[in-house]
Amino acid sequence: YFGCICQRQAHCYYPPFLWENDRRIYLDNELLPPGTPLDEGADPLDPHSYDKYTQQTYSPDIMYDRVLRFVNENRERPFFLMWTTPIPHSPMQAPDEMVQYYVEKFGDEAPIEGKGYFPSRWPHATYAAMITYFDRQVGGLVAELKRLGIWDDTIIVVTSDNGPASNSCSSTEWFQSAHPFRSGKGWGKSSLREGGIRMPFIVAWGDRIDRPHVNGHVGYFPDVMPTLCDIAGVETPPTDGISLWPTIRGKERRQQEHDYLYWEFPGGKGWVAVRWGDWKGLLRKVKEGNTQLELYDVRHDLLEEHDVAADHPDVVARMWEFIRASHTEPENPLFKMEIPEV
């Protein structure tokens, strides 16, 4: 393992150290607590007021170097690498050279205070710089795999843990990051709306995937392990997932389908969602005992604008059956969420 093991430390791209398994790897940075505001009396329009937020060692660079090192050290044998880059999560921090490239493209903009993160003089330019930075790192990894002669034997999956955040730091609405979905509060990250749980899932495997194509198959993260096990010829442990390998290689007719998909999110007031064919059931404010399940026909109402629960009580009843069958008591009490009786 290499990276951060502290949620608070992870909210700074210039931390004083990272972790390699059980030991600290110190970086040439000073401790700057997350959320540190501008100095008192500092001019928010002066770029130099933000100098303390850009230090010496950009942690994604060190993580990327370890990715390349791992690939080189294991090039003669099968390997599994999970690279969970913090880019482009808040706060908005990137090397100045790349930020200035986008300042020239976008022009001047209003700074942000940070709202619990670090302030930023050019939030749009910095967010774009972070996306470009990660894109170049992925390109560098692909180039290294080709140089080592293992590109055609390596599967790469690029995806995200959730939809765009609604805070002002990353300006996801300005960038239309969730397009065509909304990404404001209650619609993107930390929600079970389509803007919160629908995201790209990009797979590359040298020349072994028949042809580049886009597929609308509906799956979810429990499908990842069965998929990789299927490709590797390894027996899959019992899970809720189904291998997506037929879809990835363009054999959609051989793809096994889920009877339904189920999500829970205990954060905030609590969410539950069920996808059953073209129907999506959504239960909000679970922790408040809400039992008014919303129902959407996502084939015709992808943006979830028209709740048709009152018109389809039979579908709503079936959704509750799925919820009862799927909800289990979590081992971690922090994730506990009681499902209300109906």
Predicted regions and their residues:
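A short aromatic-rich beta-strand->coil structural motif
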Residues: 51, 67, 80-83, 228-229, ...
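Active-site rim elements
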Residues: 50-57, 117-129, 186-192, 208-219, ...
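C-terminal cap/loop subdomain of S1 sulfatases and analogous C-terminal strand-loop tails that border
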Residues: 1-11, 164-194, 204, 208-213, ...
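Aromatic- and acidic-residue-enriched segments that line the glycan-binding/catalytic groove
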Residues: 18-20, 87-111, 169-180
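Formylglycine-dependent
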Residues: 1-79, 85-94, 113-121, 125-128
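A structural signal for well-ordered alpha-helical segments within the folded catalytic domains
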Residues: 58-65, 125, 132-139, 197, ...
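Metal-dependent active-site segment of extracytoplasmic phospho-/sulfohydrolases and closely related
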Residues: 82-85, 130-171
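Loop/turn elements at helix/coil->beta-strand transitions in domains of secreted/extracellular proteins
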Residues: 1, 74-81, 150-156, 257-258, ...
